[in-house]
Amino acid sequence: MSAGNGNATNGDGGFSFPKGPVMPKITTGAAKRGSGVCHDDSGPTVNATTIDELHSLQKKRSAPTTPINQNAAAAFAAVSEEERQKIQLQSISASLASLTRESGPKVVRGDPAEKKTDGSTTPAYAHGQHHSIFSPATGAVSDSSLKFTHVLYNLSPAELYEQAIKYEKGSFITSNGALATLSGAKTGRAPRDKRVVRDATTEDELWWGKGSPNIEMDEHTFMVNRERAVDYLNSLEKVFVNDQYLNWDPENRIKVRIVSARAYHSLFMHNMCIRPTQEELESFGTPDFTIYNAGQFPCNRYTHYMTSSTSVDLNLARREMVILGTQYAGEMKKGLFSVMHYLMPKRRILSLHSGCNMGKDGDVALFFGLSGTGKTTLSTDHNRYLIGDDEHCWTETGVSNIEGGCYAKCVDLSREKEPDIWNAIKFGTVLENVVFDEHTREVDYSDKSVTENTRAAYPIEFIPNAKIPCVGPHPTNVILLACDAFGVLPPVSKLNLAQTMYHFISGYTALVAGTEDGIKEPTATFSACFGAAFIMLHPTKYAAMLAEKMKSQGATGWLVNTGWSGGSYGVGNRIKLAYTRKIIDAIHSGSLLKANYKKTEIFGFEIPTEIEGIPSEILDPVNSWSDKKAHKDTLVKLGGLFKKNFEVFANHKIGVDGKLTEEILAAGPIF
């Protein structure tokens, strides 16, 4: 025997324990209760007997609400919560209906991955009917019609985060709390793949032909793509549905429904559209416009009018949009903007691609400008309220933001340059195609490995000085921004109505393009109404509405050059941002209206001779150029580019006698 460790071994290698004192039994108090069960009294216990029951206690069900409108409240009082949900699901099922079978899928609310806590196995569902004149009912049954489609309806950002992290590869929570996502192969819009149905109505109403962004398709091809998108969405186990609004003006808002397959798309639209209250959702009803986003599934290249596997299709008569072959979320935002460019003018409301802010005294300014002109920077002013950064309507009562969020560029973003955007990137924000550290999840905004078009989509409430609701009175100033790399446009010019229309239609800025030998020269670019890719009607129609509203409200037009002075790019210098801000401040305060003005040659601009805090020599470009002949030659060159661009609009008559067209043409460069 060996007892070196206090134990003993027997001869066959087994263990035996020494005789003697043993450890006392643990006393639990069980005997006092008359039971042999051991009880742990060390802490409180939960009111659950299973782990599923415990999980069900973690989430409190949202209490049913009553519509704010008293009449609606009376109507809903007799309708149970279950009946309201059934009506809601029937509407969604109808949206997802195949137009050949004329019946929608069996839809049920909730995530299919979550177990039901009531023990039921077959969820209550709704079936929706869709009556169409396109094709007769066939009564055909498909595999997708035999299964349930789970609808994740108007989920909160937290719920959408969970869905994205669980099921979408490439979705991560960054160190600042934002959701980083990838948009797949497409990291920007595909304007060449955008199509608009040309029918008896749009034939005469829309702008077609040279210079137009509207590329036609026929009704049949749209229906083929619609069926393809709907079949794809119905084949999925779950889809995301957002019911939201466009336009903060309550008299002219539009109800939109977005059906998508990705949490990324649902959160993006949650941020970009106006978010309804629970009361508004209960009485939402049938949407005015529906988007079917099947972007993960390609279109059929052999279908007529298709040029690639991507197709973004608008049918204004059906008020539907179909997305195939691109997961870039910006297609939804700009697709709806195009719809507003069609619907709002029918109500005599001007839709505008502009920024908008308001002073503490209620003075409103509109900012128009292409990429790189400073529209976002100048419209975001800590001394003024932000109404919106991109899309607006000008109604009979004032201005309103179309959207409920902002879609800001992130490339080279810094806290110092753009503090408002930097601070808005937090929990709830979608960060699109950014690069981040694999361990710390800190975003590197200077890294363009995925794309230069990195973006952040966040609710407008994330901006501290946002005006909620996003509406304001009639604008006092209409500011057209141009980054003139030719260096011949004045830092600021006061425009008459005809000049405002001419430069609004032109939509000018200049880009700096590099060449192989390192020489860089400016390239003029023009985009009608500062947003040609999104307008539906002829540009002159929007310009005429703008002039009419400016005239009736006494608004002043301004052209502000944020580009070069003292020479073209490579010779002159960029106009200091501090000078431009002083100009904008003088416009806001009204002091610039009181300045002394003189007229320039070629373009005939009215320019101030003096502005406090700005060197007088830069106010007239010719004074800042050392080579006067080079200035004149460059000025004539730019004037020629304006004339050439405007040729496509010259023959379009506005009004009965075309007199307005003549006034606009006369407001252009003369030499």
Swiss-Prot record:
Annotated family: Belongs to the phosphoenolpyruvate carboxykinase (ATP) family.
Primary role: Involved in the gluconeogenesis. Catalyzes the conversion of oxaloacetate (OAA) to phosphoenolpyruvate (PEP) through direct phosphoryl transfer between the nucleoside triphosphate and OAA.
Subunit structure: Monomer.
Any one GO molecular-function label of the UniProt entry: ATP binding
Any Gene Ontology biological process: gluconeogenesis
Main location: cytoplasm
Post-translational modification Phosphothreonine, affected residues: 66
Effect of a null allele: Strongly reduced phosphoenolpyruvate carboxykinase activities in veins, leading to reduced alanine levels, which is derived from phosphoenolpyruvate (PEP) via pyruvate, but increased aspartate accumulation, derived from oxaloacetate.
Residues where substrate binds: 189, 328, 334, 455
Origin: domain of life: Eukaryota
N-acetylserine modification, residue list: 2
Residue positions where Phosphoserine is found in the record: 62
Cellular component GO terms, alphabetical: cytoplasm; nucleolus
Annotated tissue distribution: Expressed in cotyledons, flowers, siliques, seeds, leaves, stems and roots. Localized in mid-veins.
Residues where Ca(2+) binds: 270-271, 404
Region listing for Disordered, in residue ranges: 1-44, 100-127
Binding residues annotated for ATP, in chain numbering: 334, 353, 369-377, 418, 455, 574-575, 580
Gene3D superfamilies the record matches: 3.90.228.20, Phosphoenolpyruvate Carboxykinase, domain 1, Phosphoenolpyruvate Carboxykinase, domain 2
Organism: Arabidopsis thaliana (Mouse-ear cress)
Binding of Mn(2+), residues: 334, 353, 390
Textual note on the cofactor: Binds 1 Mn(2+) ion per subunit.
Protein name (record): Phosphoenolpyruvate carboxykinase (ATP) 1
Disulfide cross-links: none
Location relative to the cell: Cytoplasm
